Amino acid sequence: MRFEDYPAEPFRIKSVETVKMIDKAAREEVIKKAGYNTFLINSEDVYIDLLTDSGTNAMSDKQWGGLMQGDEAYAGSRNFFHLEETVKEIFGFKHIVPTHQGRGAENILSQIAIKPGQYVPGNMYFTTTRYHQERNGGIFKDIIRDEAHDATLNVPFKGDIDLNKLQKLIDEVGAENIAYVCLAVTVNLAGGQPVSMKNMKAVRELTKKHGIKVFYDATRCVENAYFIKEQEEGYQDKTIKEIVHEMFSYADGCTMSGKKDCLVNIGGFLCMNDEDLFLAAKEIVVVYEGMPSYGGLAGRDMEAMAIGLRESLQYEYIRHRILQVRYLGEKLKEAGVPILEPVGGHAVFLDARRFCPHIPQEEFPAQALAAAIYVECGVRTMERGIISAGRDVKTGENHKPKLETVRVTIPRRVYTYKHMDVVAEGIIKLYKHKEDIKPLEFVYEPKQLRFFTARFGIKK
């Protein structure tokens, strides 16, 4: 690792929050009380919080200034029109419906675009996305390239859709039985892996032949654009904004969690070009979120989201963002800690199968590892394996994903390289006595999205 490859933070810190580390004995009590679920730990008991990059970003001085310009009118807020103008300029879609966060957009899209029994092919599932699709009668079909399921394979653009898999599904079920293609840019559960522009264009060409719509999960689209600029031929001289605009020219719409690449703590939106879908979405947003001009958000939050979206396109910001994550991954890899490769956009994913080879998947190695990391060094991470995958809606059996990982997720503009050093040191220390990590079993298992609130105990 060459330290000159990693630039200093491209910002000055104007406001700080004091953090503390409680001692190891206290952390052991905290994790037991939380049922070995890191989601159930109080934030005050966490030293470095790498649970998620969703809503945990630091906002800029301009965004904080925008909060003071909130137009809190119930209808027709000027902040909505600023957000609408910004989204249309950057993404190029005709219509936008704001929502309180990404899953609000997923809920609306699933209701208006899926008929019971239709398939929704996509490049790997995401927890809330698949839940809304299945809740509305859809059948998710994974059509990501096979390489994405191999944690050890270091190849670019592991998020690409396998066009042969998509064509095979069309041939088997008929285009009329496919609601839309759900294309995530980047692919969270594959390790934050990007999708190439070549693949997006090819997916668009194939679906257009069959009259199938394509909706992107745009949550980390700016991170995806950086990888295209860095790794795909013909894009080195393009701006991030130009790349993002081209990406979405191959889509019919998108869902967006603004809590990631819009650099805010709350907010999201749904975009589309189709007028009928837009009218249907506006009818539903009134029921679940609020007026179509605020979608469950305060005006000030829409203003901050509009400003943050523009800030995320700055090359210096997104370069530092990607390289900070890569820095942590390289430190762990150099120490022999097994990680998912290549390092993606928003997190380093620990390969729990290789980290805890003594724990079978049915005894939740990733969940156990996340709990052990907290006890070891006060760092909160997240399970992304069999627990997150949930159960088959028909058989009730556990989904058994090939990737059993712990996501070490870096919030934007929050932590420094020194924080990454501390995280790496803690995980490396734990890896040296990994055989002490104990398998887990359910004490309480919720029926939906169980990873959020499930409780576990040491397996007897």
From Swiss-Prot:
Return one GO MF term. lyase activity
Q: Name one GO biological process term.
A: tyrosine metabolic process
Instruction: Give the main EC class.
Output: lyase
> Which cofactors are named for this entry?
pyridoxal 5'-phosphate
Q: EC no.?
A: 4.1.99.2
Q: What is an example of a Pfam family matching this protein?
A: Beta_elim_lyase
Q: Keywords of this protein's UniProt record, alphabetized?
A: Lyase, Pyridoxal phosphate
What does it catalyze? L-tyrosine + H2O = phenol + pyruvate + NH4(+)
Q: Which InterPro entries match?
A: ArAA_b-elim_lyase/Thr_aldolase, Beta-eliminating_lyase, PyrdxlP-dep_Trfase, PyrdxlP-dep_Trfase_major, PyrdxlP-dep_Trfase_small, Tryptophanase_CS, Tyr_phenol_ly
Q: PTM N6-(pyridoxal phosphate)lysine: at which residues?
A: 260
The organism's place on the tree of life at top rank: Bacteria
Subunit record text: Homotetramer.
Give the UniProt family note: Belongs to the beta-eliminating lyase family.
**NCBIfam families per the record?**
PRK13238.1 (NF009709), tyr_phenol_ly (TIGR02618)
Instruction: Give the protein's recorded name.
Output: Tyrosine phenol-lyase
